[in-house]
UniProtKB/Swiss-Prot annotation:
PTM annotation, UniProt: N-glycosylated.
Lineage: Eukaryota, Metazoa, Chordata, Craniata, Vertebrata
Protein name according to UniProt: Lactase/phlorizin hydrolase
Originating organism: Ovis aries (Sheep)
GO CC, alphabetical: apical plasma membrane
UniProt topological domain (Cytoplasmic) ranges: 1908-1931
Key words, A-Z: Cell membrane, Glycoprotein, Glycosidase, Hydrolase, Membrane, Multifunctional enzyme, Signal, Transmembrane, Transmembrane helix, Zymogen
Extracellular compartment residues: 20-1886
Length: 1931
């Protein structure tokens, strides 16, 4: 019987060939069992004679008893290894429920059976559980009538007790036997009915209560009973209604071939069709030879096939037997059998019993080998299944960059990249910089419409050393942001744990050749599952491990560059990877799947292999072997049997036998490892690129190589098209064949296939945008995938294209571009530009295949809650209008208040959009029947004055690139797209008799594309491009155009109105009328400034009204849209608030906005201001009538209220002043009687200066003038001449303008509903041609494809849309809390800035004395000769300090006041005595002195000998310090050696803007000075530490200053590095040597050295410290004294190599954000957030030293400004950020404000005022007057921070509010303040009475006007949400 067993196993292997199946997720059932007592006896005695080990006849069935036999687990594993999938278990009803009731079970028996079932599950055997087989409980025999209920109760008990372990149940296995056991007083039919009822009840209970267990239930029937049971409805339930499948007890007569078909044919009568399981098969009259068994098996299969009975499995026990001599195992495994070929030869010869082909490869080959080329390449027009996933992929090391950012550790690819072995010496350091571009990449994915994004996690970014102990939080944050952003955009993340980039630290320990890496990978995987698994539901453990094994450890072409194919690759790496994968899968399966419900798989790569010579069997075998070596190496252990393919092992064994020494070693898996591996994937990810022709290896060689070991050689067909990669040829049909092979060999329809990588590269020399070859590649390959699904039934569930963007491609560097998006690696911002293939791929996703999508007309997203025909006012506007209140409210705002940034959000349904217009973007000027427009005619006419003679012939070519435009809109996340329709594209002649269907189709496609993506179309009917045919009959001067325009509009409403819900009739008619018919600059170039604009405007208003009524009457009810027109205006700000200028400003608005708005939104007529001015000037010009036409009363009624919303285009502001212009010649501009100009302080742009604050005022004016009408800003943007993608100025523009709109909405109640940025992309900007760029997207007009690339502003605008405004970030929220009790509060000054007395009492000259007395050095020629005269005002200064309540006072010592010549030869006692008195006074007032030894005022005598450039200064400084320690050290316990050495070195000796004013050695002097300053500090620190610390007990350190720097573009690696460099060169220059390692920062040393050498020098200009100096300098601090004021935006700036300066060495340029509040100092912007960030940077960079903020403050200019709100804002904000830093665990010990009082601010003299106290320099007494900020600072000190108002009033704040009470004896003044006048009480009483009378009249007037007002309108006021009004919104 040994051969028979082998044949059975072969048959089992062949079931997939026959198509026998259960369903899509369960294996075919091959059953054995149950356990019997005889079987257990034989298993206990393996040396004795034994029966077949899994055969069980009806001998006594084993009843479970504890403990279970110890050998059972091993036995079950051997059973499973023999391809048996299920095992029968018979439950003993009587033993489980001895009393017959489920309430009292035998718990021991229950536990025993659970253990038995668990043992089966552990062995991966599924239990087949029979509820009852033989013995009935006694209780059932006594109550036959209750049998059904008792059995149902027992069944319920069993389901409940074992259901979690059982999937298949049988109620009875032998009905006849049970019938005989029941009492015989009942008839047989009655007893059968009892059993039927019992079964039915059990089935119903399972379905009702236990269906969630997912199991199936049946009853075993004898085949002969089926037809009888079906005859009786009462028993037919046993066959079809109460079973999930039919289970048969079947006997087979071997000599009667018709026996089995006859029995099975009866099952065909059952409807609906049922599945059949052969529970037991009894053979009769059968021989036991292999030949007969083979005939029997295949006869059985033939019978099943012929009768089309769906057999889901059967009992194979009858066939199983091993020879009695077999002692080695309990089961005969397939590996022990004869070869398949031998078995086939032993089979029968008859055709009826032909052996099924069992080689998956052979079956695929035979299926496709004979295809004709036409048949093979036939294109399938069909779609993919619903739910098919489309995506793109990347790998971390390919795209992320940021190789050393934020704590990431190096990977093996970083190491290889730095070895200069990559093509072009490329490295992955920056790559595509995706680490900084999450928002950019996700936007592109949105535009692409990707449904899944496959990316990999950089192991070393999470665990820098690879070990899972300390995860890198910033790396984790990056992936959290990426995953969250993907999900927010409805993109499924598919995360790969390992994509070839092993942490270098692990490679140093052996890499994948070490078992340790498996454990490390498991820790890493566990962390990822735990951290990201709540959102990631698709996991890939390894990406293409074959590549890593083959190229990384075999050929050495990939990292880590090891060339050892025989041992490292085969023996170690692949083996470790497989074990790591399996362990990770089981980890997820056991610990994470229940909660996370995700799937874990692996991505394997494989080429398809065809035999080179199909007629040669050896080539056929070689091709199959190739697949086993490439794909089966990893797939076979995971998806088949837990072990390597037999072909792989046999080939290696054969090679090793042929060679004198082994060429390869294939390790063995233990049985446990095999069980771990088998089935350890929820899906098979497959990547495929190309195919190979394979032949058997020629010649004998023992040189180890992949091909040699495999015994094959690879070839290509020269006819296969080439790609940029030598290894990829285009062979589309290979992917279909590979998928079929994978399905047959590995997945068998049970495991889904995810196609996870397919694509081809283009080369650097090819067209980088037009990748038509790749489009063809995708088109063909995707179609072959579709064939595999539709025609071959392969379960492919996704297609993921490689690659999303260009990236680092390993050995080929950046020379091969796989991306759908081109990345410009020559640009530091790494911009991405969509290729043609991106748009093709999007079309595939949209259509889900290859059939043109049936367009279902969807309704556009509605415009929310627009009231109809709002008419707030029906009376004309006054002159000046009541809207003048806007100027009264806003024009006196201080600049700080005006510009302060406001945080909040817009209404939930706010409509965010972008704008464009037809002529500016469409191009295709004469394509597809379009007629010419006036702009076509104009631009084609010589002398048109369009810059560069540009035309709109092609423009952005949007007519031919609709897919690109939709891609951008989706990426932006806009909710609306405002575009215009080209009248001449719809009606070429302008008339409805000439409809152009091609043009209509274009707009239908555009509108459908928008609506499908939930983007509302906002359509402008006319945007200046009148059909030339209509211009030829007079254009807008011809009244017939009103009807023609209405006809055109009617057609558009009828054709597009079902989807367009927002219409605008005209765009900016003011410009249309003036520029086209006034100045004549625009076509039709009519120069008639006095009459033309008014005539045209008149026609336009009537045309608009006509169209409005057409829509209102014919379409509105059905289409439910809104209609208006877009009006434009700058804001008009009066030069002064004198009435004539205010009237002029109002008049400017009436002549621009009011010209069209007043008739439409008010009373149907022009504004009086316009009528009066034009009328009066016409009369003065002796004209009979006004040049402004008039409307009839009927026309007024027709025009009034013909707009549903107010659409506004605005860009800038103007300063306006009244003037009286000349009368002639008449002109629209002169009629306004005003002058207008832009303030030169406003930021310049290409066309208008930016004045964002005007937007808020203009919106308020509209509200006041036209009522509470919904307002949409339909154009707002900025033109720049710079085409760069880093358009920071545009970001600032939109940021500030949108913020002003937000203020108008939230603070002023303007009913603002939407905002559309101008413009989507660069376009034809009228007379400016293409020289001015307004686009959020750059368009390359030199590229025939007009490629579009997102600018930085696009990313910013998307961020605003995502946030629906500008909400306050969590980081910026105000923090309430207190500082520690011992926190130091201080105020600072400096000697030269306040003392004065410059020559008093023997003081010597300092360099600042000299500098300030040098012409043109200090603003206003100010000096510090007197300053605040603090030398004589100790008492006054003390009062100021006591007002603040500070605990400390930071002052500096004037070196020359102590040592007049700078040396210790003479000590000036008078000067020293001043400091003694000052310090004693402080101490007496309980104020501790913080003394700065040097604050920039070097003795001039020392400067005369070189100053800080002379190394002797180190000793002079030490001597000076020692004098101070000796004389003052007993009083002073807080010393600062130097203040801001950066300023001393760079500004004093580099720029020359500070004393001593040296600027001619900027590349050397600052570094020499800095060098000496550091050494001087160190020597003084050591002096104090060694000599004075012990007895004086003080602390000493240095004060270092630094701005914080943010990258200008955080997504640009160069900017990130520039910001880091800025801080290191400023703060790190001095901090690094002292606080870190005694030497300069590495970046300083490297850059200065490199630039010095580039200049031709032989060494660096930066001096070097000796090793002993480094040791002496390092650690010379007790605290970190830190001065900080502001933040900058930094970006890289490369200076010419010949420029030698600090700035050139640093290579950084800096700017500031326009939204940051100004101060009185040009260099100081208020940026509180930077304070917290730089404090945290100090903590991280210098190991959290104790930090004292020794200066922080803000300046103003101008008047005394006692109510210094800007300083209050600054102090509260900055100190609050310091409190947050404390919360961040920064060791912050104290805060010092700069400054106590106004003083001499160096080169700005007394102009910059930093003081909390105002010093009146015009008063000889120089009084110190506290500002409001002094009170606020005192309050903060008193409260130790910021008490939470939610906790109620705090005592510290109540002190602030207390007012002094006047003494009774105090005289009371008889004069009182009344309305700004000092009056007697009698005078005030009289005045009050008069005012009261006036007030009564006013109240009556207001009441009357209110009545009239509310009668005509309803006002709605939007109230700002309290939660959005931060402390910053108080203005």
């Amino acid at each position: 019987m040994e051969l028979a067993w082998h044949l059975v196993l072969i048959v089992l292997l062949s079931f997939s060939c026959w198509g026998l199946d259960w369903d899509s997720d369960k294996n075919f059932i091959s059953a054995a069992g149950p356990l019997t007592n005889n079987l257990l006896h034989n298993l206990r005695d393996p040396l004795g004679n034994q029966d077949p080990p899994f055969v069980a006849e009806d001998e006594e069935i084993y009843v479970c008893r504890q403990p279970l036999p110890a050998f059972l687990p091993e036995y079950f594993r051997s059973v499973r290894a023999s391809m048996i999938t299920h095992y029968k278990v018979f439950l003993p009803w009587a033993q489980l429920l001895p009393e017959g009731i489920s309430e009292n079970p035998d718990k021991g028996t229950v536990l025993c059976y659970r253990q038995l079932l668990e043992a089966l599950k552990t062995a991966q055997l599924q239990p087949l559980v029979v509820l009852h087989h033989q013995t009935l409980p006694a209780s059932t025999l006594q109550r036959t009538e209750a049998f059904a209920d008792l059995f149902a109760a027992y069944a319920s008990f069993a389901f409940r007790s074992f259901g979690d372990l059982v999937e298949i149940w049988f109620t009875f296995s032998d009905l006849e036997r049970v019938i005989t056991k029941l009492p015989h007083q009942e008839s047989r039919s009655s007893r059968l009915q009892i059993l039927t009822d019992a079964h039915r009840k059990a089935y119903e209970i399972y379905q009702e209560k236990y269906a969630a267990q997912g199991g199936k239930l049946s009853v075993v029937l004898q085949a002969e009973m089926v037809s009888k049971l079906l005859l009786e409805p009462s028993t037919s339930v046993l066959v079809k209604d109460a079973v999930d499948f039919v289970s048969l007890d079947l006997s087979y007569e071997c000599h009667n071939e018709a026996d089995l078909p006859q029995k099975l044919s009866e099952l065909q009568t059952i409807e609906p069709k049922v599945k059949v399981f052969i529970f037991s098969l009894k053979l009769q009259n059968c021989l036991s030879t292999g030949n007969d068994i083979a005939q029997l098996l295949f006869g059985l299969l033939k019978a099943i096939n012929e009768d089309q009975v769906l057999v889901v499995g059967f009992d194979i026990s009858t066939f199983l037997s091993c020879p009695s001599s077999s002692k080695k195992s309990w089961a005969c495994s397939l590996s022990d059998s004869l070869t398949l070929q031998t078995a086939l030869q032993l089979g029968p010869d008859t055709a009826a019993y032909a052996w099924p082909p069992c080689s998956a490869y052979q079956r695929v080959w035979e299926a496709f080998a004979n295809q004709s080329k036409a048949e093979r390449d036939a294109f399938l027009q069909d779609v993919f299944p619903e739910g098919f996933l489309w995506g793109v992929s990347t790998g971390a090391f390919n795209v992320e960059g940021g190789w050393a950012e934020d704590g990431r550790g190096p990977s093996i690819w970083d190491r290889v990249g730095h070895q200069n072995t990559i093509k072009g010496q490329a490295t992955p350091e920056v790559a595509s910089d995706s680490y900084h571009k999450v928002d950019t990449d996700v936007a592109l994915l949105r535009g692409l419409q990707a449904q899944v994004y496959k990316f990999s996690i950089s192991w070393s970014r999470i665990f820098p050393t690879g070990q899972g102990h300390n995860p890198n939080p910033r790396g984790v944050a990056y992936y959290n942001k990426l995953i969250d952003s993907l999900l927010d955009s409805h993109i499924e993340p598919m995360a790969t744990l390992f994509h070839w980039d092993l942490p270098q630290a692990l490679q140093d320990r052996g890499g994948w050749q070490s078992e340790d890496v498996v454990d490390a990978f498991l820790d890493y995987a566990a962390f990822c599952f735990s951290t990201f698994g709540d959102r990631v539901k698709l996991w890939v453990t390894f990406h293409e491990p074959w590549v890593m094994s083959y190229a990384g450890y075999g050929t050495g072409q990939h990292a880590p560059g090891i060339s050892d194919p025989g041992v490292a690759s085969f023996k170690k790496v692949a083996h470790m990877v497989l074990k790591a994968h399996a362990k990770a899968w089981h980890l997820y399966n056991s610990h994470h799947r229940p909660q996370q419900q995700g799937r874990v798989g692996i991505v394997l790569n494989s080429d398809w292999a065809e035999p080179l010579s199909p007629e040669r069997p050896e080539d056929l075998r070689a091709a199959e072997r190739f697949l086993h070596f490439m794909l089966g190496w990893f797939a076979h252990p995971i998806f088949v049997d837990g072990d390597y393919p037999a072909a792989l092992r046999a080939q290696i064994q054969q090679m090793n036998k042929q060679c004198p020494s082994p060429v390869a070693q294939l390790p063995e898996f233990t049985e446990a490892e095999k069980q771990l591996l088998k089935g350890s994937a929820d899906f098979l990810g497959l990547s495929h690129y190309t195919s190979r022709l394979v032949s058997t290896a020629q010649g004998d060689t023992c040189i180890p190589s992949y091909d040699t070991i495999g015994g094959f050689s690879q070839h290509i067909d020269p006819m296969w098209p080439q790609t940029a990669s030598s290894w990829i040829r285009v062979v589309p049909w290979g992917i279909r064949r590979l998928l079929k092979f994978v399905s047959l060999e590995y997945t068998k329809g049970k495991v889904p296939i995810y196609l996870a990588g397919n694509g081809m590269p283009i080369g650097e020399s090819e067209d980088l945008i037009d990748d038509s070859l790749r489009v063809d590649y995708f088109n063909q390959y995707i179609n072959e995938v579709l064939k595999a699904i539709k025609e071959d039934s392969v379960a492919v569930q996704s297609y993921v294209a490689r690659s999303f963007i260009d990236g680092f491609e390993g050995p080929s560097g950046y020379s091969q571009r796989f991306g759908l998006y081109h990345v410009n690696f020559n640009d530091s911002s790494r911009p991405r530009t969509a290729r043609k293939s991106a748009y093709f791929f999007t079309s595939m996703i949209e259509k889900n295949g290859f059939l043109n999508k049936v367009v279902k007309r969807q309704s556009s997203p509605g415009i929310a809650n627009i009231p109809r025909k709002i008419r707030a006012f029906t009376f004309p506007s006054e002159v000046p209008s009541k809207a003048k209140v806007v100027w009264e409210k806003f024009s006196n705002q201080p600049k700080f208040e005006r510009d302060l940034f406001y945080h909040g959000t817009f209404r939930d349904d706010f409509l965010w959009g972008v704008s464009s217009s037809a002529y500016q973007i469409e191009g295709a000027w004469d394509a597809d029947g379009k007629g010419p427009s006036i702009w076509d005619n104009f631009t084609h006419t010589p002398g048109s004055n369009v810059k560069d003679n540009a035309t709109g012939d092609v423009a952005c070519d949007s007519y031919n690139h609709l897919d690109a435009d939709l891609n951008m809109l989706q990426a932006l996340k806009v909710k609306a797209y405002r575009f215009s329709i080209s009248w001449s594209r719809i009606f070429p002649t302008g008339r409805n008799t000439s409809v152009n269907t091609h043009g209509v189709d274009y707009y239908n496609k555009l509108i459908n594309g928008l609506v499908e993506n939930n983007i509302s179309p906002m359509v402008t009917l006319f945007h200046w491009d009148l059909p030339q045919a209509l211009q030829d009959i007079g254009g807008w001067e011809n009244p017939s155009l009103i009807d023609l325009f209405n006809s055109y509009a009617d057609f558009c409403f009828q054709t597009f109105g079902d989807r367009v819900k927002f219409w605008m009739t005209f765009n900016e008619p003011t410009y249309q009328a003036w520029l086209g018919y006034g100045s004549g600059e625009f076509p039709p170039n009519v120069n008639d400034p006095g009459w033309g604009p008014y005539r045209i405007g008149h026609t336009i208003i009537k045309a608009h009204a006509r169209v409005y009524h057409t829509y209102d009457e014919k379409y509105r009810q059905e289409q439910k849209g809104v209609i208006s027109l877009s009006l434009s205006s700058h804001w008009a700000e009066p030069q002064s608030l004198v009435p004539r200028d205010v009237e002029a400003a109002d008049r400017m608005l009436q002549f621009s906005l009011g010209w069209f708005a007043h008739p439409i939104f008010r009373n149907g007529d022009y504004p009086d201001a316009m009528k009066w001015k034009v009328g009066n000037r016409s009369e003065l010009q002796h004209l009979a009538t006004s040049r402004l036409p008039s409307f009839t009363e009927e026309e007024k009624r027709y025009i009034a209220a013909t707009a549903d919303v107010f659409c506004l285009n605005t860009y800038s502001s103007r300063i306006v002043q009244h003037t009286t212009p000349r009368l002639n010649p008449p002109s629209y501009t002169s009629d306004q009687e005003l002058l207008e100009w832009e303030d030169t302080s406003w930021p310049a742009t290409a066309m208008n200066r930016a004045a964002a604050w005007g937007t808020r005022r203009l919106l308020n004016w509209i509200k006041e003038e036209y009522g509470d009408i919904p307002v949409y800003i339909t154009e707002n943007g900025v033109g720049l001449t710079d085409p760069e993608l880093e358009d920071t100025d545009r970001i600032f523009y939109h940021k500030t303008y949108i913020n002003e709109a937000l203020k108008a909405y939230r603070l002023d109640g303007v009913n603002l509903r939407g905002y559309a940025a101008w413009s989507l992309m660069d376009n034809f900007e009228w007379l400016n041609g293409y020289t001015v760029k307004f686009g959020l997207y750059h368009v390359d007009f030199n590229d025939v494809n007009r490629s579009r690339t997102a600018r930085a502003s696009a990313r910013y605008y998307t961020e605003v849309i995502t946030n629906n405004g500008m909400p306050l970030s969590k980081e910026d929220e105000f923090l309430y809390g207190q500082f520690p009790k011992d926190f130091i509060w201080s105020a600072a000054t400096a000697a030269y800035q306040i003392e004065g007395a410059w020559r008093a009492d023997g003081k010597g000259l300092s360099i600042w004395d000299t500098f300030s007395h040098t012409p043109l050095k200090v603003e206003n020629n100010d000096t510090g000769d007197v300053a605040c005269d603090s030398y004589h005002k100790i008492a006054e200064d003390l009062v100021a300090l006591q007002t603040l309540g500070v605990t400390h006072y930071r002052l500096s010592i004037s070196w020359t006041r102590i040592l007049p010549d700078g040396t210790n030869k003479y000590v000036n006692e008078a000067g020293l005595n001043y400091y003694v008195r000052l310090i004693d006074t402080l101490l007496a007032a309980n104020i501790q002195p913080q003394v700065t030894i040097y604050h920039w005022d070097l003795p001039q005598a020392l400067q005369d000998v070189g100053g800080w450039e002379n190394e002797t200064i180190v000793q002079r400084f030490k001597e000076y310090a020692e004098v101070l320690f000796q004389r003052l050290g007993d009083k002073v316990k807080f010393w600062i050696t130097l203040n801001e050495p950066y300023v001393v070195a760079n500004q004093g000796y580099g720029y020359g803007t500070a004393a001593p004013g040296i600027s001619f050695r900027p590349g050397t002097a600052p570094y020499i000075v800095g060098h000496n300053l550091i050494k001087a500090h160190a020597e003084v620190w050591h002096l104090y530490n060694d000599v004075y610390r012990a007895r004086q007990g003080g602390i000493i350190s240095i004060t270092i200053s630094s701005d914080w720097a943010e990258p200008r573009d955080p997504s640009n690696q160069e900017d990130v590095e520039a910001a880091r460099r800025y801080v290191q060169f400023m703060g790190g220059w001095f901090a690094h040597p002292i606080f870190k390692n005694g030497d300069y920062p590495e970046v300083m040393k490297t850059r200065i050295r490199d630039r010095s050498l580039a200049e031709g020098l032989n060494k660096s200009r930066l001096p070097e410290f000796t090793e002993s100096e480094k040791r002496r300098i390092n650690g010379t601090y007790d605290f970190f004294g830190f001065n900080h004021y502001t933040t900058v935006l930094a970006y890289n700036l490369n200076y010419a190599s010949w420029i030698s300066s600090f700035d050139a060495d640093r290579g950084v340029a800096s700017i500031t954000d326009r939204s940051w509040p100004d101060s009185g100092s040009f260099w100081l912007k208020m940026t509180p957030f930077g304070f917290r960030r730089i404090l945290n940077w100090l903590k991280e960079e210098y190991n959290n030293p104790p930090i004292y903020v020794t200066e922080n403050g803000v300046s103003h200019r101008g008047e005394a400004n006692l109510n210094d709100t800007s300083r209050i804002y600054y102090l509260r904000s900055y100190i609050n950020e310091a409190l947050k830093a404390l919360q961040d665990k920064v060791d912050l010990r104290g805060y010092t404000v700069w400054t106590l009082m106004d003083n001499f601010e160096w080169a700005t003299g007394f102009s910059d005022k930093f003081g909390l106290h105002f010093v009146n320099y015009t008063d000889p007494a120089l009084p110190r007057i506290p500002r409001e900020s002094a009170k606020v600072y005192a309050s903060i000190i008193r409260c130790r921070g910021f008490p939470d108002p939610a906790a109620g009033p705090h005592a510290c704040l109540q002190q602030e509010d207390a007012e002094p009470t006047a003494s009774p004896a105090s005289p009371v003044s008889q004069k009182i303040q009344f309305l700004g006048l000092r009056l007697s009480t009698t005078e005030a009483q009289t005045a009050l009475n008069v005012l009261f009378a006036f007030m009564l009249l006013g109240v009556c007037g207001v009441a009357f006007l209110s009545y009239k007002y509310f009668k005509h309108s309803k006002q709605k006021h939007t109230q700002p949400g309290e939660h959005e009004l931060s402390h910053r919104s108080s203005f």
